[in-house]
């Protein structure tokens, strides 16, 4: 159960990091100066 939970956490963390990286890389080109995080 612990291995399954750690695997799920790893997958979720990788998806979240990919989403944040894609958002930060696509946001300035799409709408510059509109929103900054």
UniProtKB/Swiss-Prot annotation:
Presence of the UniProt keyword Plastid in the record? yes
Q: Which UniProt keywords apply?
A: Chloroplast, Membrane, Photosynthesis, Photosystem II, Plastid, Reaction center, Thylakoid, Transmembrane, Transmembrane helix
A single GO CC term, please? chloroplast thylakoid membrane
Q: Which GO terms describe its biological process?
A: photosynthesis
Keyword Chloroplast assigned: yes
- SUPFAM superfamilies listed in its UniProt record: Photosystem II reaction center protein I, PsbI
Q: How does it sit in the membrane?
A: Single-pass membrane protein
* Predominant subcellular localization, coarse grouping: plastid
A Pfam match: PsbI
Which region is the signal sequence? none
Per UniProt, subcellular location reads as: Plastid, Chloroplast thylakoid membrane
Sequence intervals crossing the membrane:
1-21
Indicate the family of this protein.
Answer: Belongs to the PsbI family.
Subunit details: PSII is composed of 1 copy each of membrane proteins PsbA, PsbB, PsbC, PsbD, PsbE, PsbF, PsbH, PsbI, PsbJ, PsbK, PsbL, PsbM, PsbT, PsbY, PsbZ, Psb30/Ycf12, at least 3 peripheral proteins of the oxygen-evolving complex and a large number of cofactors. It forms dimeric complexes.
Q: What does this protein do?
A: One of the components of the core complex of photosystem II (PSII), required for its stability and/or assembly. PSII is a light-driven water:plastoquinone oxidoreductase that uses light energy to abstract electrons from H(2)O, generating O(2) and a proton gradient subsequently used for ATP formation. It consists of a core antenna complex that captures photons, and an electron transfer chain that converts photonic excitation into a charge separation.
What name is this protein filed under?
Photosystem II reaction center protein I
Species source reads: Bigelowiella natans (Pedinomonas minutissima)
